[in-house]
């Protein structure tokens, strides 16, 4: 039936539909579920009477949940198909956000932020990994780069929406924000289940860019060489590099709005506008850097992005006036989601379309460890020093370590022998 509806003669390849829905999944799973906290944090922190350490602890709880499910979610997607895993993950994330809005204490909020993170991990990793099945190798960087812009659209929407909701609902504005995020995410879960397909062969199609006459056969789960994921030295190297991104960027993103308000002299509305500007600049980052990695290599792109982000974080810490904050936001926006896009494309290169979600889930374990540690460490440093600047400088230093680690990657990460498509 589906093969008749979505025929090979359709004017638009269904891979583009998959990419559009995948971008929407990222919008909810990361954009609303994780970065929504950045915009809501000042009001939520005041409403619940949280210290900086506790505020960082809520972010850490969310990221521990993400870490717990990202590896399992990727493996489940490889075995049972991304469609059902993505749908279930978004549903769990929506429930977690709804309950976050009902929280009355740090303990309640931490529990529900962890549940939200679990749903995010179970949906985001398979959504990006799914692109490896729908796009041939030479287009995977581009596709992943577009997919991660879901977070960019979220920054734009959050920058516009949250200040108005906070103004309109007063003391309970932060709760209403979480309710809105939950409703959007639940709707996306239903939409994703309706539209997503696990692989081109489900519709009698080939991956976008594949030559005519290529086989549409898929490998069954029991025939997959699972050990190729966990025994690959290159995959472990990628994971270790990914730690640096997780640790550094989440410090910047978690405390971005709070730093602007408490140390940069911004109002909530002005901070929201700068958050939106960051989102606009980040719209093309995955597309640009994904294409750069397709043309110049994954290694070159990773080194360049880490250096740009290290400079953005240090600028934010050392120049907390309007010009410095704006330049920092622009630089980070230009490179924001490029590292996840490059990592997703690299996993597709190394492991093939069926194992790509499992590989991405595995290296996301390392990424998640960095993310889980970052906000808590930053909050402790901020409470001890009474400023967020030292924590931001730490983020900058860790990003530089990521650049150094990337220099030791092989120049050509393509066509390795670890997979058999």
PLM regions: where:
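Core transmembrane helices of Major Facilitator Superfamily
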Residues: 30, 115-127, 332-343
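Extracytoplasmic gate region of multi-pass secondary transporters
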Residues: 37-41, 232-284
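Helix-breaking motifs and short loop linkers at transmembrane-helix boundaries and internal kinks
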Residues: 49, 81, 102-108, 136, ...
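Conserved MFS/SLC helix-loop-helix module at the cytosolic interface between two early adjacent transmembrane helices
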Residues: 68-106, 293, 299
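Paired small-residue
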Residues: 96, 107-115, 323-331
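Cytoplasmic helix-loop-helix junction between adjacent transmembrane helices
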Residues: 112-150
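Helix-loop-helix hairpin linking two adjacent transmembrane segments in secondary transporters
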Residues: 146-201
């Amino acid at each position: 039936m589906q093969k008749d509806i979505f025929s090979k003669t359709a004017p638009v390849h269904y891979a583009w539909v998959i990419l559009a829905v995948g971008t929407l999944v990222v919008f909810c799973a990361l954009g609303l579920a994780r970065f929504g906290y950045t915009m809501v944090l000042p009001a939520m922190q005041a409403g619940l009477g949280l210290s900086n350490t506790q505020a960082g602890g809520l972010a850490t709880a969310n990221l521990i949940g993400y870490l717990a499910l990202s590896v399992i979610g990727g493996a489940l997607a490889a075995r049972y198909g991304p469609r059902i895993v993505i749908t279930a993950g978004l549903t769990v994330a929506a429930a977690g956000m709804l309950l976050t809005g009902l929280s009355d204490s740090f303990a309640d909020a931490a529990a529900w932020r962890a549940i939200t993170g679990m749903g995010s991990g179970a949906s985001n990793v398979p959504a990006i990994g799914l692109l490896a099945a729908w796009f041939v190798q030479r287009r995977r960087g581009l596709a992943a780069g577009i997919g991660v812009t879901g977070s960019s659209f979220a920054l734009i929407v959050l920058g516009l929406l949250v200040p108005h909701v906070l103004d309109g609902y007063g003391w309970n504005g932060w709760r209403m924000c979480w309710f809105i995020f939950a409703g959007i995410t639940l709707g996306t879960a239903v939409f994703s289940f309706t539209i997503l397909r696990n692989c081109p062969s489900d519709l009698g199609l080939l991956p976008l860019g594949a030559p005519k006459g290529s086989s549409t056969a898929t490998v069954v789960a029991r025939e997959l060489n699972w050990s190729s994921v966990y025994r690959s030295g290159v995959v472990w190297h990628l994971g270790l590099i990914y730690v640096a991104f997780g640790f550094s960027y989440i410090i910047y993103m978690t405390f971005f709005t709070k730093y602007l308000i408490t140390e940069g002299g911004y109002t909530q509305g002005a901070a929201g506008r700068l958050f939106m500007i960051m989102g606009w600049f980040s719209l093309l980052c995955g597309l640009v850097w994904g294409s750069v990695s397709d043309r110049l290599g994954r290694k070159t792109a990773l080194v360049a992005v880490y250096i740009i982000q290290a400079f953005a974080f240090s600028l934010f810490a050392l120049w907390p006036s309007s010009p410095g904050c704006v330049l920092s936001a622009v630089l980070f926006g230009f490179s924001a989601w490029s590292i996840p896009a490059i990592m997703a494309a690299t996993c597709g290169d190394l492991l093939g379309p069926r194992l790509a979600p499992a590989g991405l889930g595995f290296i996301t374990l390392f990424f998640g460890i960095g993310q889980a540690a970052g906000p808590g460490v930053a909050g402790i440093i901020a409470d001890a020093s009474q400023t967020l600047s030292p924590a931001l400088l730490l983020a900058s230093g860790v990003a530089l370590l990521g650049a150094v680690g990337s220099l030791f990657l092989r120049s050509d990460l393509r066509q390795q022998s670890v997979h058999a498509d």
